[in-house]
């Protein structure tokens, strides 16, 4: 088990950190939208961002979710919040270090490439499956997003249609 460039795998960790930090994210998004953080407008926007990031692997949604981790709406500050969460959860080889491209966001980061490991990925997915990631309800929502993943050619590509895959 060793750290490697994460590519889009980092989005699952950002999803987990975002569920953990959802109250602050709601406040940050409410400020941007000039809406109450508990409003349906904020709820709908955050759901679309999360769905686009996880289900459709949208890079700009990832960049925006990282920025929303703090009221400053700055990528590097948000990355530090996520990385603190990752350390607290025991993900030793995973870190958000850079924006993802292609996207509308100018390249920015704390380092060269986002990192993760096979062990960290397996641990996160197991926690989600066992309903132990943030809360049972949040785990269910995360699993639903993963089950609806739009890209079906890689991980589930060689499996029978009847096999349920969350990726």
Show which residues each predicted segment covers.
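Small-residue-rich helix-loop
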Residues: 144-151
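Short, Gly/Ser/Thr-enriched beta-strand-loop segments that form substrate-interacting elements
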Residues: 153-167
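Short, well-structured active-site flanking segments
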Residues: 19-47, 135-140
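Active-site SXXK
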Residues: 4-33, 53
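Structured, acidic catalytic/metal-binding patches in enzyme active sites
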Residues: 38, 56-58
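Mid-domain, small-residue-enriched loop/turn segments at the edges of structured enzyme/sensor domains
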Residues: 50, 60-133
């Amino acid at each position: 088990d060793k750290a490697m460039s994460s590519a889009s795998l980092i989005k699952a960790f950002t999803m987990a950190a975002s569920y953990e930090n959802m109250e602050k994210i709601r406040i940050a998004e409410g400020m941007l939208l000039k809406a109450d953080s508990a409003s349906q407008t904020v709820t709908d926007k955050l759901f679309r961002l999360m769905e686009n990031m996880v289900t459709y692997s949208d890079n700009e949604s990832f960049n925006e979710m990282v920025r929303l981790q703090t009221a400053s709406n700055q990528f590097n500050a948000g990355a530090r919040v996520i990385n603190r969460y990752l350390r607290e959860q025991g993900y030793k080889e995973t870190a958000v270090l850079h924006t993802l491209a292609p996207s509308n966001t100018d390249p920015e980061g704390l380092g060269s490439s986002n990192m993760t490991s096979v062990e960290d990925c397996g641990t996160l997915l197991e926690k989600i499956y066992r309903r132990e990631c943030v809360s049972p309800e949040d785990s269910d929502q995360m699993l639903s997003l993963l089950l609806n993943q739009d890209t079906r050619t890689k991980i589930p590509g060689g499996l029978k249609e009847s096999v349920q895959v969350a990726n």
